[in-house]
């Protein structure tokens, strides 16, 4: 007796890829000597679609390069002052993406264009990070920020330099082609200066060692980046990323660099009883001294010559004065005052902050030496009680923060009710 069920199973056709039989799938398409099911076709389509999207996003970024003037005007909408730095960044970024076009062009005439990474030097809160962030948003390219203080030489406790690339990959969902058109900002770069000007017999794993490790990465190499981040080990998978197409912007405050510059500029002056007094010698401000920086000063500070060579474009950001801080508070598109006014608008309340109060906030930030970074915390403290009580209050039309609000730390604003009668909060 023949077992029919057994014969039926044997005659079933199977997908050559997933090995599911024709009863387990909706459709089975036959080829010359193979079969493919509808599920495998769908999977293949998804893979091809994803690759096409990756390529299209890469080439879209590649083709649309704003002119230096357009980049400058956009930066001008969000950052107050720093005109020279904005001009330097605009030209450098335009040339960088023009270089990427040249690399991918069929008309490439075998002339290799070098990469020009940037070094931004300026005090804390002067806009170094904001400049890089605004650039990346405008160009619609992947952007990541890394802190140089966490980096150590390979084999020591801390982060490997490849983690910098890994952060960029995370920002673009591990799309390697897109990551290779990105911008990486390395903050606190001055903190990896070597501990002394002379080479030491002991290893400087978080200073000169990190600089040496960053050399090839910044210049351009095929970096092996661990998929899951962390330390490298032989068993894990690596992603290959060409860093020659990534623009690196390094920034730092370089505290004490002005003293090195001052010492260099006064070297020609003799001292002693018989020395002639140079009447033309002017006492320069710290800001003016920083504008005179040369690569030799950075070497004395602790950066190795090879590292400075990888950052050919150097620009100095000015220290922010009170007038600039007042403008930062109110003029840019995303100015802090406008942000808080929008926040209050969500409660259907208009917020008005008088000029004297804005000047007070700017002066307080100056006294704290925090630059523009300290402005938000000052405003938060100023509006804390008001923001605490406002959601529980009704019928409020306008809140006015005037000079009387800040006198003797009396943080009680003027409230204008919708019934058109002016009152002041009781402070309860």
Curated annotation (Swiss-Prot):
Function (record text):
ATP-dependent specificity component of the Clp protease. It directs the protease to specific substrates. Can perform chaperone functions in the absence of ClpP.
Q: Name one Pfam family in it.
A: ClpB_D2-small
Q: Does the keyword Chaperone apply?
A: yes
Q: Which residues bind Zn(2+)?
A: 15, 18, 37, 40
Annotated ClpX-type ZB domain ranges read: 1-56
Stated name of the protein: ATP-dependent Clp protease ATP-binding subunit ClpX
Q: Name one GO cellular component term.
A: HslUV protease complex
Entries under SUPFAM superfamilies matching the protein? Glucocorticoid receptor-like (DNA-binding domain) (SSF57716), P-loop containing nucleoside triphosphate hydrolases (SSF52540)
Q: Where does ATP bind?
A: 123-130
A GO molecular function annotation here is: ATP binding
Give the species this sequence originates from. Answer: Buchnera aphidicola subsp. Baizongia pistaciae (strain Bp)
| Alphabetical list of InterPro entries matching this protein | AAA+_ATPase, ATP-dep_Clp_protease_ClpX, ATPase_AAA_core, Clp_ATPase_C, Clp_protease_ATP-bd_su_ClpX, ClpX_bact, P-loop_NTPase, Znf_CppX_C4
Q: Which family does it belong to?
A: Belongs to the ClpX chaperone family.
Give GO BP annotations, semicolon-separated: cell division; proteolysis involved in protein catabolic process
Encoding gene, per UniProt annotation: clpX
- Subunit structure of this chain's protein: Component of the ClpX-ClpP complex. Forms a hexameric ring that, in the presence of ATP, binds to fourteen ClpP subunits assembled into a disk-like structure with a central cavity, resembling the structure of eukaryotic proteasomes.
Q: Which UniProt keywords apply?
A: ATP-binding, Chaperone, Metal-binding, Nucleotide-binding, Zinc
Entry annotated with the keyword Nucleotidyltransferase: no
